[in-house]
A protein has these predicted regions:
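Helix-boundary and N-terminal cytosolic regulatory elements
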Residues: 1-125, 150, 204-219, 311-329
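Surface-exposed loop/turn and secondary-structure junction residues enriched for glycine/proline
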Residues: 15-18, 52-54, 60, 69, ...
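Small/flexible residues
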Residues: 16-19, 201, 292, 298
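Extended amphipathic alpha-helical scaffolding segments in membrane-proximal extra-membrane regions
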Residues: 38-39, 68, 78-257
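A cross-family signal for key residues in well-ordered alpha-helices
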Residues: 44, 135, 268
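Hydrophobic alpha-helical transmembrane segments and their immediately adjacent juxtamembrane loops
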Residues: 48, 232-329
Length: 329
């Protein structure tokens, strides 16, 4: 789908056009969302561009993502999308700036693009040319990633409180046994996946912004200032995301340690139960009635004496370490 936007007094305005109609001269932003081959050829012929294919957009080399060609600036970024679903993912979006027009090529519909259009309608003075539209789109993407990082930070704090909050544990003695470590591990895993995708997206945006500032394409001082500010924001967010990743690993290790402690407690319970059940089992297994020699004189006394010693040795006497028998056989 090809969406065409032009500048108006009320901000960006989408132009309704027929499928076969030529591109209007006043177009500032051409947004290609899952474009058809015909739409790609139309934009390429009108602006003299070579729009990257979906496979080319996925290439990880910087030379394939960030370059200048025939007076056009090509910028491809990895953007985290589908954050409101159970399976967030990263997708590539290409920005092409040539002259007074901006072209975006994408195969996902992330929330920052829709937010940017709404913001432009409320603040028409913020987007006066194609360069400002480019800066505005990147700002919207960065703000969305900031929301993700803040949400992950809150999730980590909540998970940490579930593990280490002593007041909560003392208020409810049964809380520890009622905690669902499976759900806790799922929350930690989801937070880890989100923070990893956010860090990947931030690294991509950092390279994009650095290349855009060093490009030979003419940009207004205002736009360059906005790009420098975004670069600083991305660096700060990357550092904070790295801190959260480290903290998340600590919470994960603590959760696994709690699981190990609970497993050991269960094993202790089984050990105590075994202490009380083993002596009767030994006596029952002896089958005294079927041992005729044991009924005769001293042999019977010796046999019953050994059984009594086994019972006494199995009892946890006061002062003995838990789980340690009196005698070792």
């Amino acid at each position: 789908m090809l969406s065409v936007y032009c500048l108006a007094s009320a901000g960006l305005r989408r132009i309704e056009r027929n499928q076969d109609a030529p591109l209007p001269e006043e177009a500032v932003w051409l947004d290609l969302l899952e474009p058809t081959p015909e739409e790609e050829r139309l934009v390429e012929a009108r602006l003299g561009l070579d729009i990257p294919t979906r496979e080319e957009m996925r290439e990880i080399e910087s030379s394939s993502r960030l370059y200048e060609e025939e007076g056009a600036l090509y910028l491809t970024a990895t953007v985290v999308t589908k954050l409101d679903t159970a399976l967030p993912e990263n997708a590539e979006i290409t920005f092409i700036l040539k002259g007074t027009r901006l072209v975006t090529n994408r195969y996902v519909d992330p929330l920052p693009f829709r937010r940017f259009v709404g913001y432009s309608e409320r603040h028409p003075q913020a987007n006066t040319n194609a360069q400002a539209v480019l800066a505005g789109l990147i700002e919207s993407i960065v703000n969305r990633i900031a929301d993700v990082i803040e949400r992950v930070g809150s999730d980590i704090d909540s998970a940490s409180a579930d593990i280490f909050n002593r007041q909560r544990l003392l208020a409810d003695k049964h809380r520890r046994s009622e905690r669902d470590f499976r759900k806790l591990l799922e929350r930690i895993g989801q937070s880890g996946e989100l923070i990893a995708k956010a860090r990947e997206s931030l690294a991509s945006l950092a390279r994009l912004l650095a290349f855009a500032q060093q490009s030979t394409i003419a940009m207004t001082p205002e736009v360059r200032t906005r790009l420098r500010t975004l670069s600083k924001d991305v660096v700060a967010m990357s550092d904070h995301a790295s801190f959260l990743a480290t903290n998340l690993n600590f919470v994960l290790d603590a959760t696994l340690g709690m699981i190990n402690i609970d497993q050991n407690n269960i094993l202790k319970i089984f050990s105590v139960v075994t202490v009380f059940l083993l002596p009767p089992s030994v006596i029952g297994a002896a089958k005294v009635k079927k041992a005729p020699d044991a009924r005769r004189g001293k042999l019977a006394l010796i046999f019953y004496g050994l059984a009594l010693v086994a019972i006494l040795a199995s009892i946890p006497w006061p002062g003995m370490p838990a789980g340690r028998p009196l005698f070792r056989f």
